[in-house]
Regions:
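Catalytic Walker B motif of ABC-type/P-loop ATPase nucleotide-binding domains
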Residues: 99-103
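ABC ATPase NBD Q-loop/coupling interface
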Residues: 1-12
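Conserved ABC ATPase "signature" region
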Residues: 37, 52-72
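Helical segment within the ABC ATPase nucleotide-binding domain
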Residues: 114-127
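Conserved catalytic motifs of ABC-family nucleotide-binding domains
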Residues: 95
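Conserved ABC ATPase signature
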Residues: 48-49, 74-78, 82
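ABC ATPase nucleotide-binding domains
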Residues: 175-257
Length: 259
């Protein structure tokens, strides 16, 4: 808006930006609906009364986070995952131009993580809301973010498009990975390779070898894998876990030398 934040009144600031923190808030005798309705504070009069329009926005916000069924529940008695969804609904209820979220996927199961990311994506694309999120799950950041900022322990900052910033080498360096690997393309983590002389050869391919590779890793059995084309979906996991991977270049027939 071309103005300093310090020039905003508290209500102007609240209409512009909403925040969702991981810190738990303590409430007494407040339903989930009451907590969400707090997001309408910047728009209410001196007495804080909600209009019919406000009530509609509260219901829409609850519906957006799939929380209408717990709207009348005591906020202090719901689970951490439900609490996170209610706090997001409160932020949505403010109708902000900017929303800042601190690890919003904490305490959420996979279904509600996906739903939350869908909501944030919709807010950014359809409602033109600037969404700023702090995440430890880089695999989620890679899928949803237009731009990412990585901050290392030494304070070094990397900023840019996910496909430019999230590389295997950079992530290994950023997190100091020494026990295992992270595959940026698939957003998957593999534990360290089993040590010792390989006693097993796994003939996989087309996804048939992945679960066997991981089971052998859990059992601590070193193994070889192949013959895999370099574009086979088994290849990244085999490369991370196998002592040796016998490969062939993609789109080429398996040659005699490979055997």
């Amino acid at each position: 808006k071309g103005r300093k934040i310090s020039d905003f009144t508290s209500k102007e600031y609240a209409k512009t930006m909403s925040v969702v923190l991981t810190e738990k808030i303590k409430t007494e005798m407040m339903t989930c609906r009451d907590v969400v309705a707090m997001g309408r504070y910047p728009y209410t009069n001196y007495f804080g009364r909600l209009t019919k329009e406000d009530e509609v926005i509260v219901n829409e916000s609850l519906k957006k986070v799939s929380a209408l069924d717990i709207a009348e529940n005591d906020f202090s008695q719901i689970s951490d995952g439900q609490r996170q969804r209610i706090m997001l609904a409160r932020a949505i209820c403010q109708k902000p131009e900017v929303i800042v979220l601190d690890e919003p996927t904490s305490f959420l199961d996979i279904r509600h993580k996906i739903e939350l990311l869908d909501i944030l994506q919709e807010m950014a694309v359809k409602d033109n809301v600037a969404v700023i999120v702090s995440l430890h799950e880089i695999e989620l950041a890679a899928k949803i973010a237009d731009y990412v900022m990585c901050v290392g322990a030494d304070g070094k900052i990397e900023f840019g498009r996910p496909e430019k910033i999230f590389t295997d080498d950079r992530i290994s360096s950023l997190y100091g990975l020494t026990h295992g690997t992270y595959n940026c393309m698939y957003g998957s983590t593999e534990l360290k390779k089993p040590e010792g002389t390989p006693k097993v050869f796994v003939a996989g391919g087309a996804g048939t070898g992945v679960f066997i590779y991981r089971e052998l890793q859990r059992l601590g059995i070193a193994f070889r894998a192949g013959i895999l084309y370099e574009n086979d979906c088994d290849f990244p996991v085999a490369k991370a876990l196998a002592s040796e991977v016998i490969t062939e270049k993609m789109f080429e027939p398996i040659g005699k030398d490979t055997f």
